[in-house]
Each structure stands twice: as C-alpha cells, then as structure tokens.
Amino acid sequence: MNIVGQIKEKMKEEIRQAAVRAGLASADELPDVLLEVPRDKAHGDYSTNIAMQLARIAKKPPRAIAEAIVGQLDRERMSVARIEIAGPGFINFYMDNRYLTAVVPAILQAGQAYGESNVGNGEKVQVEFVSANPTGDLHLGHARGAAVGDSLCNILAKAGFDVTREYYINDAGKQIYNLAKSVEARYFQALGVDMPLPEDGYYGDDIVEIGKKLAEEYGDRFVEMEEEERLAFFRDYGLRYELEKIKKDLADFRVPFDVWYSETSLYESGKIDEALSTLRERGYIYEQDGATWFRSTAFGDDKDRVLIKQDGTYTYLLPDIAYHQDKLRRGFKKLINIWGADHHGYIPRMKAAIAALGYDPEALEVEIIQMVNLYQNGERVKMSKRTGKAVTMRELMEEVGVDAVRYFFAMRSGDTHLDFDMDLAVSQSNENPVYYVQYAHARVSSILRQAEEQHISYDGDLALHHLVETEKEIELLKVLGDFPDVVAEAALKRMPHRVTAYAFDLASALHSFYNAEKVLDLDNIEKTKARLALVKAVQITLQNALALIGVSAPEQM
C-alpha cells in the first residue's frame, strides 16, 4: 500500500473538487493538478500552481483563484495542518504528519513487494541493450549500457510493465567474416605458419587464444581444408567462444537476458525479404543507380537510405528494419533501445522505417548512453596497465567490484558523460556514495541484530503511535513513504538514476536519524520497539532500492 501516493491523490482530488465548487471551472475544463515538493522546506511539504493554470479559464487573477480554492478545501480529508498562498498564487501545503504513522506498518506488510505499482498496467515492453558485436571484449560503454538497461528493466517490472530483456547478436555481415579470417590467421600462426591478419581484422588477445585452442584441439586438420569450409567452422567456433565470454561477463555483472536474438535467423527465416516486401507494397522502395533505396525522407529523415548496394549486399539498415518489424509483430507496445552515442544519427531512419512499415514510430524509444572516462590517482586512464589496450568491463569489475561499477554507472542520466573515479569507488568513506548507502544498510542490520541479542523485537503497530515526535523521525518517514512514487516516476520517465538518488537520500536520512536519536532505549521499550520497526522499514526499502540497480545490501561492513 502506497500511503504517500494515496494522500497525494486525495489532495489532488480535493483541489479539483474545490475548484469546481468555487465555480472556477467545470470538471471537464480542469487541467491536471500538479503537486511539487518545494526545494525550500519553509514553503511547505507540497505546492501546486493550479491557480496559475486556471487563470485563462476562470478569467481571474491567480491569487484570487488560489484564495477561492483554499476557501473550499477540506484540510482534515487532505491530512493538511495548514495552507498558505505565496507569490503570484502558489498554494503551499504543510502536512499533518500523523498520516506518516501508517508508512512503517505498510512497508513491513509489503516486504520485498514494497515499491511495486501498476502504473505499467501490464504493457508489453521490450528493452534491447548491450547487443555488442561478438568479436571481442565488452568495453566500458557496453558496461554502462548494461547497468542502465538492467536497472531500467528491473524498475519497469516493479512498476507493473511486462518486460522482455533482449540481446541482439550481430552474427551476420562483414564483421563476422572478419572474425573468421582473424581466427584463421591466429590458427595458422599458432601452427608456426606466418599468415597476416586481415586489414579489418581483430587484434585482441582473445582471438590469439582462440587460434591456440584450435591448434591444440584439432592440430593441422584445417590446413588442407577448402577455405570456405574452414572459414565456416572458424566463424561458428569464434562466435561461440566470444558469446560464451560475453554471457559470462554479463552474468557476473548481474545482468540477465530473456532472449538472445540472432541476426542470422532473420536471413534464414525470410524475415528480411518480408520487411522489404512490406516496404515495397507500401510504396517506400525504389531502384536507382543499381541500388535499392528506402524513401525515408517521406517520414522526415534528411535523405533517403540505401538498403541493397550495387553489388547485391545489404546495408546494416535492412536487417535492422526486419528485426524491428519482428519485434512489433511479437506484440510489444514499446520498444526501448539502449544505444551508444555513436548511434544518435540512426534514430530518425529507424523511426522512419517503423512508420513506413505501418506502425506508430513513437513505439520506438531510444535511450542514448554517453562515454565513460576512467580516472585513477587524479589522472585519466586511457589504457589497461595489464594489456596496454582499452580497459574492459571485466577488468573494471575485478578492479573495483561489481557493486561500485553498477552504482556509479546508474548514478547519472545515461545521456550525460560520466567520469568514473576508481579511487573514490573503492574508498571506505562517506564521499564514496556506494559505500555510504551500503553502510546505511549494514548499520540498520547491526541495530536489528543488537535488538535480537537483547530479545527485543520490532512492533509495527507501536509505530502507529510513537513515530512522529521528532524532526529526524518525520524526515525519515517522508523519505520512506516516497519510494513507490519514485519507482513509478523512474519507470514512466525511463530514469533509473532516480532510484540511485533515492537510495542515497534514504541513507542520508537514516544516518541523520541515527546520529540524533537513540534507537535502543531499555528505559522505554515501547518507543524502542516502534523505532526498531522504523529501522526494519529502512532495511527493507534500502534492499528493494539497491536490488533495482543491481547492487548488494551487505549486513556487515
């Protein structure tokens, strides 16, 4: 049960009814009532600008409208202690904090389900993320996309969406041919034959390793084999090796997928031809200069796009169009793609393709993930000390730990550049946000253990009577009560960093409460049991928040 959400809905409904009772507008004319939390606590717990919104309809000054609304409000029904009109007509509400007493029992009853809502209404959403080429190690951009994507999936599911997590395997096209040729070169080199890597080949240590494994496992079996047959084997072997490595890295990063979708399957199933036929039937395909073109300018793209080149090979766009047609045919109402910043220009042509196929282009949402810069000892880390190459996701996980990487990567909006301070990420200090938040969980766990050792249990019913007496209790209760709304907002606005910020705010409120108040007071067992219930509610909520962003909640540190 979302106590704070229910109160806010009651307040909005009461404001709507008050406006109608005051004769300012009919129910049909009323705009949505917005309740904001003022930055300055002196301006109340909530504020609305409804008077300004109604000025045009009511044909009155906003301040006069505000006075008319306030005169019609039922404070008791709204759990409001007092109301003030400020500035040009803002209505500020100061809450009667007694409503907060129900927050703790609600959290204790809900447990792991606290924070769930049905704002998604079971809508089928597909989130496609990471989708790195299976030709080498996952890098930091992939890691950030994985952290943001997985957190978003968790949050969407918590908010009542039916979520499918999907990884698109780019296992067709030129890059896979280059993978096979690179494996071939490394295989022959492992046998002592000097074969150069192709110009567009892959130079990673993993390809060297694949070549050695093939030489050890099969000896010179492939030397006399026809090149086409040999490359087909090396392609499959290399793909399998790289995919297994990617899957292992993502599993260790706590990022699961429901579907691993092969690009090759689009060719084998005829889905590429189907997409091309659909576009042709709808009049968006034409031939020019020996190539096949998609008339994407009909949907606002800056130029038409080639789908089939003069030599008969496909551009990247055609299988991507077929893939998105397949997604929509599977019944997804929203397609959320999490792409690197280098794909920004690709968005208009994909939306154009979806529209040309006969679907709503707004079904596609693209979240852009910006670059990550690593810093250590105050200097930017450009290359791995161990390999002399770009730092991989695996190396960063091993260097600073999964919790730190997941938290830091989910801490900012994905479309902003991120500077990752490796020294800060491993420091045991309050300046390290992941340490600060996890320490809050360890602290409440320690309090609950101490209480158990003294045979004192928490009591949610006592929380109804003993928990709105001090400023720090009230602040902590307010933050606890906000969690379901934060999750719902993070889901609807696709902002996983809102949950990370919430976890930090809750930890901060807990530390402030702990420093100001005594929890275990043997001279006042009733208050102790009530405060233990509050501490238990913090533990549950912190666990739930951290689980959404893939971070552990340690009981001891």
UniProtKB/Swiss-Prot annotation:
InterPro entries: aa-tRNA-synth_I_CS, Arg-tRNA-ligase, Arg-tRNA-synth_N, Arg-tRNA-synth_N_sf, ArgRS_core, DALR_anticod-bd, Rossmann-like_a/b/a_fold, tRNAsynth_Ia_anticodon-bd. It is an enzyme of class 6 (ligase). SMART domains: Arg_tRNA_synt_N, DALR_1. Its main location: cytoplasm. It catalyses: tRNA(Arg) + L-arginine + ATP = L-arginyl-tRNA(Arg) + AMP + diphosphate. One of its GO terms (molecular function) is ATP binding. It comes from the Bacteria. GO terms for biological process: arginyl-tRNA aminoacylation. It is found in: Cytoplasm. A motif ('HIGH' region) lies at residues 132-142. Coiled coil: none annotated. It holds the Pfam family Arg_tRNA_synt_N. The keyword DNA repair does not apply. The keyword Phosphoprotein does not apply. GO terms for cellular component: cytoplasm. PROSITE patterns: AA_TRNA_LIGASE_I. Its EC number is 6.1.1.19. Keywords: Aminoacyl-tRNA synthetase, ATP-binding, Cytoplasm, Ligase, Nucleotide-binding, Protein biosynthesis. PANTHER family: ARGININE--TRNA LIGASE, CYTOPLASMIC, ARGINYL-TRNA SYNTHETASE. Monomer. NCBIfam families: argS. Belongs to the class-I aminoacyl-tRNA synthetase family. This is Arginine--tRNA ligase.
